[in-house]
C-alpha cells in the first residue's frame, strides 16, 4: 500500500454521510416549499430560532491545498426562494489559524435550499478552527430580485417580515500538514489508439477532445477556421470511403473524369463532426436531399437521413413531425448547460432550407430524430458561439433616425428562443431557464414544436450613439465595432473603433457602456486602389489594412489609432485576387487566394516578415504558374492549406496537395495528393478528394507488433533468431506494413491512390529487450523493419533458463506504438569430453590406472568443453576383486551368526 495515500477515517465517513443527509433533507424541504400552497401573511410577524452548521470537507489537508467548507442553516430553506429569485441566507466563516490570527470569509450567500460551500487555501501547518455565523434575516422577498409579479399568491409571501434569529455554529477543527493530501491519480494521456467516448474520470484528457461544428463555432476571436485539440503530423490514411462515382470513366472518353464540380454546380463537402461521428450533406450530384452519418474512426456509414420523405429515426420510429423535406445541414452545436438542477452537454444538429433560411430545425445528433424548430431567426449580426454553446448573433440596431440615432445592442440567442416566456430572460451563461411552465430550471425543449425566435434576445440594451458594425466579440467582456473610414482623392473620412462593456453586474444584467473610442486615418486608396480593413486583434492591440493592388499591409494601434508599422514590402502578384488573413498566436498569416500559392507570416505587433512558404512544385500542369493555396484550418500549431481553385478543369491538373505547414516557421511537415479542403477533429483530418470522389480520413492509427523466437528451446551457446512484424491496423489498410514517417506520403499514395510503389520505403524502428532467468533486463538493441513489415535480430543467450523477449515499436507521427512478448528456453549444454579408449593388453600395464577427471564447463562460457567419460571396458580388475571379497565376508558373517543362535 502506498504510504502517500490518505484514507478517510470512520469519523470522516460519518461526516460525509451527515453532509449527504443534510443536503437530501434540504432538497426535500425545498420540494415541499415549491408545492406548498400560498397562505396569508403572518400578523404579527413570526420569529424563528436557527441553528448554523459548518463542516470542512477534509479533516486533514496539505498546506497550499484547497479546503472546502460546507455550511447551512438548520431550518427550512428561505421561504420566498424560487429559482434565481427570492430571499437567501447569508453567512460568515471565521477561520482561526495556528499562529493565533483570524480571517473572515463572507458574506457568503446560500443557494435556494439554504446552504452553500466555499473554498479556503491554508498557508500554515497546524490546527485550524472554523466557525460559521448567521447574522439573522428578516424576510422581504427581494434581495435576489423580486419574483415576477410577487404578491399574495406567490411562493413564501406569507413569510414576509418574519424574522430568523442569528446563530453561531460550534467550532470545528481541521489539521493542515506539510505533506499534501493525495489527489485523484490522473490517467495519463493516451499512447495507444483511442476512440470516444472519453471516460468522464479522465478530466485531463479534455485537450485532445475536439469537434468540428462549422459556422461560427470555429471562429476564435476575429479569426476563422480554427480547430481545437490536436492535428496529425503525418499523411497517414486511417480510411477512405466512396462519396460518389469518381476518377477516370471510360476508354471512349480518354482521360476525362467523372463529374466532380464546377463554378455553379459543385459537389460541396462541408462536414460536421460531433463525438466521433461525421455528418455531411448528400452531394449535389445525387439529386436527392438528406445527409450521411459516418463513424470517424472507421469510415463506416451509420445512417442516411432522407429528407425527400418521412424522416425515420435510428430507433426505427417515425418522427411525429411527419417528415422533413428539402433540408440541408447548416451547422452543429454542443449546448453545455450548468443549471441549478441539470448539468451537462447536448449535441445537436441544425438544418435550414434556401426557401426558408430564417427557420431552423433542431435534431438529436445521436438518434438523428427531429426535435423542434425556431422560426423568425435573426438574420442580421455577427455570429458567435457562446461559452455555453448557444448560437449568438450580436447586432446594432438604430431605433431612431440618422440625424437622431437611438442605438441598441442586441444579442439573439438560440437557447433564449426555446426558453423565452415574455417576462423572464436567461442569462447569457445559461445559469437560469425561464421557459414557460418550467419551475425546475431544466432544459426541456417541446418536441415537434415551432418556437418564435422574434423575441429571443438575451441582450437588448440601449447604447451610446456609435457607428459602424461589430468587428470582434469577447463574451462577458466587450464587443468592438466601428467603421473603416476612407482616404482618397475626395478627402479623408476618419475611421472609428469603439468598445462596449459586456460584463454583467451583481444581478446578472449587462449595461453596455462605452469603454473607449478611437479615430484613425486609413491608408491612402487614391488612384483607384482598394484598401480594406482587416480583423481586429484585441489580445495584441492591433488592427490592420490590406491592399490587393499593391500587395501591402499596414498595422495600427488599437489603443491610439496610429499607424505602427507598414506598409510591408510587395509580395506575390497573385495576391491581386485576394489576401485572406488569420491571426494566430501573435502572427498575421496571409494567403494568396485562388491562384497564388504563397503563405506569409508577419509579427502582428511589428509587421516583421517571419517566414514565407512556397509550395513544392511537381511538373508544370497548374494553369496559374504555381499551386493555389487556400486555408483549410489551423490546429495544434499546424496550418492546413489545399490547392483547389474556383474552377476545376476536366481532366484536372495534377499536383494538387493537401499540405500541412508548421505555423511557427513555415516548414512543410507533410503533404498528400488531395484535391479539396478538409476539417480537423479528434486529431484527424477529414476531406473530400476530388481526384477520386472519395472521403479520406488522415491521422495517427493503431499498429500491431508480433514476435517469434527460433528455436523455441535452444542449447546454451546457440544463436536465437528473433523476428516478427510491425503492421498498420487502421481500418483502411489493416495488416499492411508500418512505414516510416519519411516514406508515408509515397506509401499512402501507393496504397490508396494507385501510384507507384516506392522503391526506397523503409519500415519503423523496433527496440528489443530480454529478461534473463535471473530477472536481469538486457538491451538487445534496435532493428528496423523493412517495407514488408518484417524485422529480425540474432542473439546468443548467455545462461540457461527461460527468457522473455519483448519487441517494442514506440510509435511515430503515423502510428501509435505497440509491442509483443515471447518466451523461449535455453537448456544447459551437455558436458561431453573426447572418448578415452582402453590401452592394449600388456603384462606391464597397471590394472588400477586412474581415470581422467571430467572437465567442468564454465557457466557463462559460450562453448562448453566436453566431458571425458571412460568406456565401460576400461574398469580396473582390482575393483572386481574387492567387491568379490566383500561379498564372501558378508556371507560368512551371516552364517556364523545363524549357527550361534541355533546353539543357544
Where are these regions (language model features)?
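C-terminal membrane-anchoring or membrane-association module
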Residues: 4, 10, 891-904
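Proline/serine/threonine-rich low-complexity linkers at boundaries of modular beta-sandwich domains
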Residues: 39-51, 696-704
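Structural beta-strand segments of beta-rich domains
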Residues: 65-69, 718-722
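Residue-level recognition of secondary-structure-to-loop junctions
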Residues: 117-124, 128, 134, 785, ...
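Enriched for extracellular/lumenal, surface-exposed ectodomains of secreted and cell-surface proteins
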Residues: 128-161, 799, 803-817
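Repeat-blade elements of multi-bladed beta-propeller folds
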Residues: 191-216, 252-291, 313-360, 381-412, ...
